[in-house]
Amino acid sequence: MRVADFHFDLPEALIARHPLPERRASRLLALDGPTGSLAHKQFADLLDYLRPGDLMVFNNTRVIPARLFGQKESGGKLEVLVERVLDQHRVLAHVRASKAPKPGTRILVEGGGSAEMLQRHDALFELAFAEPVLPLLERVGHMPLPPYIDRPDDAADRERYQTVYAQRAGAVAAPTAGLHFDEALLEAIRAKGVDTAFVTLHVGAGTFQPVRVERIEDHVMHREWLEVGQDVVDAVAACRARGGRVVAVGTTSVRSLESAARDGELKPFSGDTDIFIYPGRPFHVVDALVTNFHLPESTLLMLVSAFAGYPETMAAYAAAVEQGYRFFSYGDAMFITRNPAPRGPED
């Protein structure tokens, strides 16, 4: 399969650079996987597509203010984007500077704080901060908005680039399908008889990396840490027993569940995943999906195509562009039911 098969033209004006005033004010494009039919709705209409007995699985990762500005002790300016917190003081980070820091380099953080560069791991730098890193980031860090938002973060992003159910700090990008849910909608979902469960996948900056190969089979996925607990395994089993559907909120929830069921059976799992889901790969757990609109030629668009079918997905995206839907992290959403016989671009 060619990466170019997943290209579509997206007008710049459709990239959402700010959130709407209300979380649930977004639009919702519903795609019925088995038939390919589309329905244009509001996000609050998601309730109409859920059934009593369904199970919704959310990713409860919490975005950390992972971007730091500062300078080397010698004077050169730099920017740090934390990729992964290793322990109370150490992180792996991307560092942008005119000259890459060498081991032993001391970094002075804008707003207070310092770190030492310990060693390099390919594209990432291992840094040790003089004080506990999570409180430091909360104090002086900036929210790591995606590159396509193309503006400095502001105070509103601290709240809006975060789900209302975020619990476990560690992500450097939001699980954006969850941004549409407010407390009132979550209460209405539970009141309808829909169960909820939470996985954790700490979304890394690699989620924004372009696919740099021509054939998608040659692409190597970035690694992210996830945890699927026994409580989630039990909730999925109970859902299956009562005839309900497993509805994943976001591609990160899909990747978590399918990583924990790689041999076909869902089991508790804690560790790194590099799962790459593209057309032809089976789904063992997820029956329906809530997701935002993704970048052209991205691995997330490939995942959606694997779930809904390639022609159905690309037709839905063409309709979304024509109808002026807002794209990417702060944009609109889709509700998709799984296509039982999905076709790829070469079928």
Curated annotation (Swiss-Prot):
GO cellular component, one term: cytoplasm
Subcellular location: Cytoplasm
GO molecular function terms listed in the Swiss-Prot or TrEMBL record: S-adenosylmethionine:tRNA ribosyltransferase-isomerase activity
InterPro entries, A to Z: QueA, QueA_dom1, QueA_dom2, QueA_sf
UniProt record, GO biological process: queuosine biosynthetic process; tRNA wobble guanine modification
Pfam family, one: Queuosine_synth
Gene3D superfamilies given in the database record: QueA-like
Keyword annotations from UniProtKB, A to Z: Cytoplasm, Queuosine biosynthesis, S-adenosyl-L-methionine, Transferase
EC number: 2.4.99.17
UniProt catalytic activity: 7-aminomethyl-7-carbaguanosine(34) in tRNA + S-adenosyl-L-methionine = epoxyqueuosine(34) in tRNA + adenine + L-methionine + 2 H(+)
Superkingdom of origin organism: Bacteria
Main enzyme class: transferase
Pathway: tRNA modification; tRNA-queuosine biosynthesis
Function: Transfers and isomerizes the ribose moiety from AdoMet to the 7-aminomethyl group of 7-deazaguanine (preQ1-tRNA) to give epoxyqueuosine (oQ-tRNA).
Family as reported in the entry's similarity comment: Belongs to the QueA family.
Subunit structure: Monomer.
Descriptive protein name: S-adenosylmethionine:tRNA ribosyltransferase-isomerase
